[in-house]
């Protein structure tokens, strides 16, 4: 009996992997064995960096809040402590947005928290 191969599925699988490597330079974009490694590594980086992105944004918000807080004469840690003690329900993302877009409102929040 002749050897039976499922060439339709094989070709589809290769095509799917090669499609993920679109735009890669040199053999990383067209040699299947190299493409597999390149795509695997790219997916590992993507997985890792989806988590790192969350950390980076939180860090950015904290930096912005700290800069605005220091302009109002208080450090970030003392401001956040005061906000938590006064039970002011505002997250860092919103607080950073207010600090950048509306400094007057941020100053009011600082004054409310510290009184």
From Swiss-Prot:
Keywords: Ribonucleoprotein, Ribosomal protein, RNA-binding, rRNA-binding. Pfam families: Ribosomal_L20. GO terms for cellular component: ribonucleoprotein complex; ribosome. Gene3D superfamilies: 6.10.160.10, Ribosomal protein L20. SUPFAM superfamilies: Ribosomal protein L20. Coiled coil: none annotated. One of its GO terms (biological process) is ribosomal large subunit assembly. The keyword rRNA-binding applies. GO terms for molecular function: rRNA binding; structural constituent of ribosome. NCBIfam families: rplT_bact. Binds directly to 23S ribosomal RNA and is necessary for the in vitro assembly process of the 50S ribosomal subunit. It is not involved in the protein synthesizing functions of that subunit. Belongs to the bacterial ribosomal protein bL20 family. This is Large ribosomal subunit protein bL20. It comes from Chlorobaculum tepidum (strain ATCC 49652 / DSM 12025 / NBRC 103806 / TLS).
